[in-house]
Amino acid sequence: MTTIDRYIIKKFLSTFFFAVLIFTMVAMVIDFSERIDDFLEEDVPIREIIWKYYLNFIPQINAMLWPLFTLISVIFFTSRMAQNSEILSILNSGASFRRIMRPYLIASSMLAFIHLMGNHFIIPIGNQIKVAFENKYVSKIDLDSKNDHIHLFLDDHTKVYIKYNSKSDSIAHGFGIEGFNDDGELIDETVADLARWQTETQSWRMENVKIRHFDGLEETFKRFPRLDTVINLQPKDLVRRDNYKTTMTTPNLIQFINEERKKGVGAFTSFRVEVHRRSSEPFTIIILTCIGMAIASRKTRGGMGIHLAIGAVIGALFIVLGRFSSTLSTNAGLHPFLGAWLPNIVFIFVVIYLVRNAQQ
């Protein structure tokens, strides 16, 4: 690593972390001003506000914008270098444009690795503490319940359906269990007006139970006023964790997706997008670094202002495309991988074009 490499890396990282520091301070002030009434109303201890909320708020809010911070930082210090003819001097010394990109790639790869580890492990663990704090003092809500018309496959031969689930008292109304043979044919059906979860026995107590058993063309019917059943289903399984996907580390998130798939639950596409997003965002840092460097390395009459304006447009387009692809993946059947990676795939061609036409 040459002196110029160290110089550029130092400029890159110092500018980046200064931008992060400024944004963090502004974000904390704005968030605190919005939540101070809740904190005072609930008489939240200062220690908990600092250590349980803001200590975990900072990584979460920063991780969302690290790619944009990278783009702005690269454009800012590279544009200054270009205006001071530093980039031109390096090129005149015999270094190629791609050689100048090396320290940029080293620094951005370091940030991408930190972001990758944060997305997959560190931030979700912090979000567990932050969300618990918010549920206790701010929003005061627990997990959102799946209320109406629930259909779950417990295994290949057992399906449970619930007309309405009451989370507050763990009662499932319109409770039914269907059994299937290896050919997928219905062989028995149990229907109850309601089923109440029994914590002591870890079972469901059904009331006004009707059981039908099918054997070819023959059908038998039984009725019970009350009947307990032990199945692989608990009240916690009747919970929609859409707002809690950020609290699960990636291994836990993948495990949850597999469990939901086995149950036959189809509404977990957003979770699959989340898994891919955690890997795509760090790669975005490298892509936007290359774009910012290619744009700002050329000395222009407009100076830093025009470079920052172009960077702002690119950042806005990247965000819009990311939101658009995520929505398509969640609601329109686009594969979750493409939903998370499509902006990177599109903008990598922008990188190729800019680098090929950059100042040599």
Indicate residue ranges for each PLM-predicted region:
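Transmembrane alpha-helices
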Residues: 1-156, 167, 185, 215-219, ...
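Extended beta-sheet lipid-handling architectures
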Residues: 8, 172, 190-192, 204-211
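Soluble periplasmic/extracytoplasmic beta-strand elements of cell-envelope proteins
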Residues: 151-152, 159-161, 176, 205
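Extended lipid/amphipathic-ligand handling interfaces
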Residues: 162-164, 192-198
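Extracytoplasmic/periplasmic/luminal assembly and interaction segments
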Residues: 163-183
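Short, solvent-exposed aromatic-acidic interface loops
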Residues: 178-182, 208-216
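Membrane-interface helix/helix-cap signal primarily in integral membrane proteins
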Residues: 194, 211-229
